[in-house]
Every structure is written in structure tokens, then in C-alpha cells.
């Protein structure tokens, strides 16, 4: 599974220019899939969370490390 680390969601290239997160539109929960969690911890040891962020023109889904780095960024247009 090809997950790459990025400093933020915009650096991944998946989020279109002009996308702005909606205030209060963020859901965070622990990574439940053991295989994905194991792979993420191989990339960067520590705590990872699954994040779903609502924005002005769609949603962004990604995994976030405690350090703020992200992986597996996907954009879904509304």
C-alpha cells in the first residue's frame, strides 16, 4: 500500500487550490484497520488518527500523525 508522508494536506497535491476547511467540520478518530495502522507506524512511529475535513468545495480524508505530518490524502468533491 503506497502511503507517502507530507508536511500538510496541501503538499500532497491532492487538495485543489482554493479549498478552505470549514470551521467545526473536522472529524478525528483512531485508525481501526490493523494493517494500515502497522504500515503507518512503519513510516513514522507514534500515534496516528484518521481525519475527515469538510471544506468549501469537498471533503479531504487523510491520516494524521501527532507531529502534524499526513499520509494517504484523498479529496472528494461535493
Which residues does each PLM region occupy?
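Catalytic toxin/effector domains delivered as secreted proteins or via bacterial secretion systems
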Residues: 1-78
Amino acid at each position: 500500500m503506497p502511503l507517502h508522508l507530507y508536511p500538510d494536506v496541501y503538499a500532497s497535491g491532492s487538495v485543489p487550490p482554493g479549498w478552505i476547511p470549514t470551521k467545526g467540520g473536522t472529524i478525528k478518530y483512531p485508525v481501526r484497520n490493523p494493517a494500515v495502522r502497522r504500515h503507518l507506524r512503519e513510516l513514522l512511529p507514534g500515534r496516528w488518527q484518521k481525519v475527515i475535513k469538510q471544506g468549501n468545495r469537498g471533503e479531504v480524508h487523510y491520516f494524521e500523525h501527532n507531529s502534524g505530518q499526513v499520509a494517504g490524502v484523498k479529496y472528494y468533491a461535493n
